[in-house]
């Protein structure tokens, strides 16, 4: 049952599946409590109900459109996402964004471990610490088993999530003043853009690993069907969760922040139903956190392989890498639980500054400059066309981060030009388009020798 492949090329003989598997994975993976908490932040931080929901949806669609373009690279090239960055940054140069991606995976996994640990503790009548440790052990097992098990988990998560969310929505709305919610409608540009940033950053954060879960699809699979499956799966799943978060925060007020799990479980009208909701929370977090653990294993493997010059990984190394990343997440979760909500908000928004220019460079290069042509064997050999470092791409990546800094409005970082946009954080828009335009306009300085068509390993 355990997956044999890691970051190496998936030959056509091992390809399988249908684009709809992407829908169930991203739909089910986003029906979970961290997305609920993120949606709630739009209200907790001052937004109204109506325009928070609209802003979240706008952000979902913007971020998911970019994310889905990354997903198309998986079936076309048969490789996980981050090793493809070597085509733009060089074999060693790709380590720069890879290290940041690993930090992101650890952060998301840690936040998920905090919330899942609370639910696991209630479900099994154990301490929060024990709940987090058991949850982390489950994540290790599933991440080691790999691709097929993760997709099966996504299908189950879709079913469990739909049932749990339908119940929670009905219970919440039956006890609420719907008229008051509908009239909670006072547009404010700062809080609207905050909602857009929350959801767009959520989606863009998936870009570094989305093709990890599409790379086994047949090479000739429909690009339109694949794009739509990822797009609608992640938008519908995340918007459902964030809508529940907005409504819950608006109804519960100060009773929700810091008590997210207990409040949602309180929607259960009996002990049995409360246990079902605890289970649904745990199951949803298992799916989502497994995506992060598997992605972190892929990224760490890509970093190590740059220096070892081989992409095949033994089962022992696979287990060791997964254990290392999950353990790091668990330790952070154990140390940061009391301040979870505050720190997670800052972390999620600040991540945009580092992943927006990476995404812009990768997509601009793949779709507009390389025209989808990648020399796959050269990705593992710095002596070939992609070299050790591509200073052109690395320089523009740094520029892409820097041009965002004056426009960032975040407790972790605040700069001087946010007044132009009434104190709103629009750095991600400036960073993505600015980096993409610069990368394309200055392409004559790129010294790579690009292939006329994709070159695949002999199998």
Language-model segment annotations:
Residues 1-49, 191-197, 215-225, 446-459:
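Membrane-interface "cap" regions at the ends of multi-pass membrane proteins
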Residues 32-35, 58-66, 101-110, 142, ...:
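Selective recognition of specific alpha-helical transmembrane segments in multi-pass small-molecule
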Residues 43-54, 118-132, 148-157, 263-269, ...:
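Transmembrane helix-loop boundary segments of multi-pass membrane transporters
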Residues 82-86, 113-130, 218, 292-323, ...:
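Helix-loop-helix connectors at the membrane interface of multi-pass transporters/channels
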Residues 117, 130-172, 185-187, 228-232, ...:
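Membrane-interface loop-to-helix entry segments
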Residues 126, 159-185, 199-207, 244-251, ...:
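Hydrophobic alpha-helical segments and their helix-loop junctions in multi-pass secondary transporters
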Residues 303-338, 385-405:
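Loop-to-transmembrane helix boundary motifs in multi-pass membrane proteins
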Residues 358-438:
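C-terminal membrane-solvent junction of multi-pass transporters and transport-like membrane proteins
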């Amino acid at each position: 049952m355990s997956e044999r492949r890691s970051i190496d090329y998936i030959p056509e003989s091992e390809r399988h599946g249908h684009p709809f598997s992407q829908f169930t994975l991203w739909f089910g993976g986003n029906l979970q409590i961290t997305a609920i908490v993120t949606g709630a932040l739009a209200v907790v931080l001052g937004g109204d109900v109506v325009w928070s929901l609209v802003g979240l949806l706008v952000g979902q669609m913007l971020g998911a459109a970019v994310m889905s373009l990354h997903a198309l690279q998986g079936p076309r090239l048969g490789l996980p996402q981050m090793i493809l960055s070597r085509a733009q940054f060089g074999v060693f140069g790709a380590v720069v964004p890879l290290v940041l991606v690993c930090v992101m995976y650890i952060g998301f996994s840690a936040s998920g471990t905090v919330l899942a640990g609370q639910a696991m503790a209630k479900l099994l009548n154990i301490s929060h610490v024990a709940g987090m440790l058991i949850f982390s052990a489950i994540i290790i097992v599933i991440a080691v088993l790999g691709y097929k098990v993760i997709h099966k988990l996504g299908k189950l998560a879709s079913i469990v999530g739909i049932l749990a969310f339908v119940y929670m929505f009905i219970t919440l709305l039956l006890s609420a003043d719907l008229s008051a919610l509908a009239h909670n409608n006072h547009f404010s540009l700062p809080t609207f853009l905050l909602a857009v940033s929350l959801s767009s950053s959520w989606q863009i954060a998936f870009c570094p690993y989305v093709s990890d879960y599409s790379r086994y699809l047949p090479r000739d699979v429909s690009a339109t069907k694949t794009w739509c499956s990822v797009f609608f799966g992640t938008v519908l799943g995340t918007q459902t969760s964030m809508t529940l978060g907005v409504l819950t925060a608006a109804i519960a007020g100060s009773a929700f922040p810091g008590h997210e799990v207990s409040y949602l479980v309180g929607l259960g009208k009996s002990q049995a139903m409360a246990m079902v909701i605890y289970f649904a929370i745990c199951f949803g977090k298992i799916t989502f956190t497994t995506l992060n653990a598997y992605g972190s294993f892929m990224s760490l493997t890509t970093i190590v392989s740059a220096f070892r010059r081989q992409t095949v990984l033994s089962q022992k190394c696979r287990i060791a890498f997964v254990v290392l990343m999950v353990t790091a997440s668990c330790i952070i979760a154990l140390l940061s639980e009391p301040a979870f909500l505050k720190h997670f908000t800052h972390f999620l928004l600040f991540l945009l500054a580092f992943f927006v220019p990476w995404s812009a460079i990768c997509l601009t290069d793949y779709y507009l400059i390389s025209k989808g042509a990648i020399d796959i064997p050269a990705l593992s050999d710095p002596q070939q066309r992609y070299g050790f470092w591509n200073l052109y791409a690395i320089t523009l990546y740094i520029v892409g981060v820097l041009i965002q800094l004056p426009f960032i409005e975040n407790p972790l970082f605040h700069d001087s030009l946010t007044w132009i946009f009434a104190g709103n954080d629009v750095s991600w828009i400036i960073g993505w388009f600015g980096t993409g335009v610069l990368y394309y306009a200055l392409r004559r300085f790129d010294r790579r020798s690009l292939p006329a068509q994709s070159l695949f390993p002999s199998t």
